[in-house]
């Protein structure tokens, strides 16, 4: 994976902790919108969204980032340098850092939904934080929305759906719940 031993995508001078996790949450709330990644020319599929935001935040704040690549399982980090990127210009601002964007594109090309379950660095889903009985509210507007109910959390990498949801719909009636 790392073809050369010199150079880094970026130098991490900070470390993840609870304070940085709170700052990440706040940054997402302030910056993540439907057009953010498009405005910055970042191609995505569904899993790429989670990876891209985490890596962008890490790059901005000089935090480490690491994920396992699909297929090989190799660890790809902010210190993983490929020979093709050595001469690629960097910049202070992440959106102008061509080396970072090349590395991000490589990461997004080599990860997918199944790598997320055991690879949400550094925070994994834990039963203490998300468990049966939790609710998810999707409020479309002041008048309409959708509620989903967490039935079970299965933290087993062989299980295809780690979070099991129960949901109903409108109109109100006696029905089998969607699972």
What spans do the regions from the language model cover?
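Acidic helix-start/capping segments at beta-turn-to-alpha-helix junctions
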Residues: 47-51, 65-84
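Short beta-strand-centered aromatic/proline hotspots
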Residues: 145-156
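Sec/Tat-exported extracytoplasmic proteins
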Residues: 54-61, 111, 140
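Conserved active-site-adjacent core of cysteine acyl-enzyme catalytic domains
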Residues: 79-133, 143
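Active-site-adjacent structural segments surrounding the nucleophilic cysteine of cysteine proteases
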Residues: 1-48, 55, 63-69
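Hydrophobic beta-strand signal
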Residues: 135-138, 164
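Short solvent-exposed strand/turn elements
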Residues: 158-179
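Extended serine/threonine-enriched, polar tracts that run as long, contiguous segments within proteins
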Residues: 141-147, 162
């Amino acid at each position: 994976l790392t073809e050369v031993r010199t150079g880094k995508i970026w130098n991490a001078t900070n470390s993840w902790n609870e304070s940085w996790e709170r700052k990440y949450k706040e940054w997402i709330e302030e910056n993540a919108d439907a057009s953010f990644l498009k405005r910055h020319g970042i191609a995505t599929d569904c899993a790429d969204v989670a990876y891209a935001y985490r890596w962008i935040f890490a790059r901005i704040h000089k935090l480490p980032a690491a994920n396992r690549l699909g297929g090989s399982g190799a660890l790809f980090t902010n210190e993983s340098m490929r020979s093709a990127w050595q001469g690629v210009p960097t910049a202070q601002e992440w959106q102008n850092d061509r080396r970072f964007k090349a590395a991000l594109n490589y990461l997004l090309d080599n990860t997918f939904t199944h790598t997320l379950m055991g690879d949400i660095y550094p925070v994994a889903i834990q039963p203490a934080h998300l468990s049966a009985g939790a609710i998810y509210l999707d409020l479309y507007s002041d008048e309409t929305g959708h509620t989903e109910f967490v039935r079970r959390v299965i933290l087993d990498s062989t299980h295809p759906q780690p979070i099991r949801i129960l949901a109903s719909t409108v109109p109100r009636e006696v029905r089998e719940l969607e699972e």
